[in-house]
């Protein structure tokens, strides 16, 4: 099975607090993987490293590859990092859309990386690009909102627009950082259904950070659980049982309670 993402010896320190400890991870083509863990476990930090939004510690000897290209090595971004990012759709918890633009215009932003610079200056997109954007919106059930300003949409609708933008980008990997954290249950279900659909039908590799264990078990065949910056569990979601859940979350809660008592 083809390895799409390779992480070796990744360590990260913030203000003398080590957020990640020598993390090793391989993710294969077509997988939908959930990164689980309590707050502060390092799951979002790990995800941001995968696209080079942040860099690891320079002394750790770390190396991250995505689609066969080096993203970063020993805390330094690769010179051709833009080529890696061009194939990676990143979905943020807070949507990261341009509120003053329409839904269609936000999706077209996904084509900027493959559009000549002079066209981007004037927002001149081709008819073919606009058709692809409408097709992406159709995939996520948002085509009827194409000409509506994105600021008028609900949180779940905005997240689906962000997914459509990744489709417009023709991303081969989607990294989704807490995409349902602020959504109601119905909106969360629709967003996760959408991610699973493009994973299964388009073969796009999806890595998603989640707090909600039930969604991870329902939608992802593989779970990578982090605990205090270490990989605590990496395996089938079917084998992530109550005992592992208890050790991952409740032991952390006991540590926090003891710290407060002290």
Curated annotation (Swiss-Prot):
InterPro entries referenced in this protein's UniProt entry, alphabetically: AAA+_ATPase, ABC_transporter-like_ATP-bd, ABC_transporter-like_CS, ABC_transpr_PhnC, MetN_ABC_transporter-like, P-loop_NTPase
EC class (word): translocase
Gene3D superfamilies in UniProt: P-loop containing nucleotide triphosphate hydrolases
Main function: Part of the ABC transporter complex PhnCDE involved in phosphonates import. Responsible for energy coupling to the transport system.
Membrane disposition: Peripheral membrane protein
Localization per record: Cell inner membrane
Pfam families, sorted: ABC_tran
Entry keyword annotation includes Ribosomal protein: no
Catalytic activity: phosphonate(out) + ATP + H2O = phosphonate(in) + ADP + phosphate + H(+)
Listed CDD domains: ABC_PhnC_transporter (cd03256)
Protein name: Phosphonates import ATP-binding protein PhnC
Keywords: ATP-binding, Cell inner membrane, Cell membrane, Membrane, Nucleotide-binding, Phosphonate transport, Translocase, Transport
GO molecular function (one): ATP binding
Sequence ranges assigned to domain ABC transporter in this UniProt record: 5-253
GO cellular component, one term: plasma membrane
Assembly and binders: The complex is composed of two ATP-binding proteins (PhnC), two transmembrane proteins (PhnE) and a solute-binding protein (PhnD).
Keyword Transferase in annotation: no
Organism: Escherichia coli O6:K15:H31 (strain 536 / UPEC)
Family of the protein in this entry: Belongs to the ABC transporter superfamily. Phosphonates importer (TC 3.A.1.9.1) family.
Major location category of this protein: membrane
Binding site for ATP: 37-44
EC number: 7.3.2.2
Origin organism lineage: Bacteria, Pseudomonadati, Pseudomonadota, Gammaproteobacteria, Enterobacterales
């Amino acid at each position: 099975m083809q390895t799409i993402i390779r992480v070796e010896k990744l360590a990260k320190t913030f203000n003398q607090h080590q957020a990640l400890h020598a993390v090793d991870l391989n993710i294969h083509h077509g997988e939908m993987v959930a990164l689980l863990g309590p707050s502060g476990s390092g799951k979002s930090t790990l995800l941001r490293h995968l696209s080079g939004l942040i860099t690891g510690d320079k002394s750790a000897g770390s190396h991250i590859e995505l689609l066969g290209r080096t993203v970063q090595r020993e805390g330094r971004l690769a010179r051709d990092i833009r080529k890696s990012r061009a194939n990676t759709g990143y979905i943020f918890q807070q949507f990261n859309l341009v509120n003053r633009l329409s839904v269609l215009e936000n999706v077209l932003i996904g084509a900027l990386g493959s559009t000549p610079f002079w066209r981007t200056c004037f927002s001149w997109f081709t008819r073919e690009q606009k058709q692809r954007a409408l097709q992406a919106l159709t995939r996520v059930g948002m085509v009827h909102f194409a000409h509506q300003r994105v600021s008028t949409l609900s949180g779940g609708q905005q997240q689906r627009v962000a997914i459509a933008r990744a489709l417009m980008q023709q991303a081969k990997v989607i990294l989704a950082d807490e995409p349902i954290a602020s959504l109601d249950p119905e909106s969360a279900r629709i967003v996760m259904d959408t991610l699973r659909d493009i994973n299964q039908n388009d073969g796009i590799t999806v890595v998603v950070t989640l707090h909600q264990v039930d969604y991870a078990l329902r939608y992802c065949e593989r779970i990578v659980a982090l605990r205090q910056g270490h990989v605590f569990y990496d395996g089938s979601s079917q084998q992530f049982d109550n005992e592992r859940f208890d050790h991952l979350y409740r032991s952390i809660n006991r540590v926090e309670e003891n710290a407060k008592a002290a």
